[in-house]
Design a protein with these regions (language model features):
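Ligand-binding loop in jelly-roll beta-barrel domains
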Residues: 118-144
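Conserved short histidine dyad/triad with adjacent acidic residue
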Residues: 65-82
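Bacterial N-terminal signal peptides
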Residues: 11-21
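Glycine- and acidic-residue-biased ligand/ion/polar-headgroup-sensing regions
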Residues: 85-96
Length: 158
């Protein structure tokens, strides 16, 4: 239980630090969002039909909506990736599998996936018919501000 309290403290601290970063974004930088209260954000995630949508962007954080379906990515998954920054994913709609460092866990609406930097991960939609909609919080910028990609294949390759 002591380990879980430490994890909870880490998550709460990370979320509060990200909120603080959002509130200090600079309006003069057009690549950043202004400080904002986003009402009913999970409903906005459900409305998103794009592969990826940059919802809010700050200097060192970003909120991205994702819609994982065979229409947006024929593989019906994010794809194996590793980041130089932390990532927190909230499952909003649909069911999936989260693979973190080779360990698979089934996920459903209301679940959170915490991914520290450097951890190899993938999120897979387990339904060929229903979308898997997620909200992802990055502790860095993952895609350009105000970007929207209808399909995974639309994302510029690095």
């Amino acid at each position: 239980m002591k380990h879980m309290n430490g994890i909870k403290s880490l998550i709460v601290g990370l979320i509060f630090s990200q909120v603080a970063m959002f509130s200090t974004s600079f309006a003069s930088d057009t690549n950043q969002s202004d400080a904002e209260v986003a009402s009913q954000v999970f409903n906005e995630v459900k409305k998103n039909n794009n592969w990826k949508l940059a919802f809010l962007t700050a200097k060192d954080a970003q909120v991205v909506f994702m819609n994982i379906t065979p229409n947006t990515n024929p593989n019906n998954e994010i794809g194996i990736e590793t980041h130089k920054f932390d990532q927190i994913i909230f499952v909003i709609e649909g069911n999936g599998k989260a693979i973190l460092s080779g360990k698979t866990t089934m996920v459903k609406p209301g679940d959170m996936i915490f991914i520290p930097q450097g951890v190899e991960h993938n999120v897979i939609n387990v339904s060929a018919k229903k979308p898997l909609k997620i909200l992802s919080v990055y502790t860095a910028t993952d895609i350009p501000a105000n970007s929207s990609y209808q399909k995974k294949s639309d994302v510029p390759q690095e």
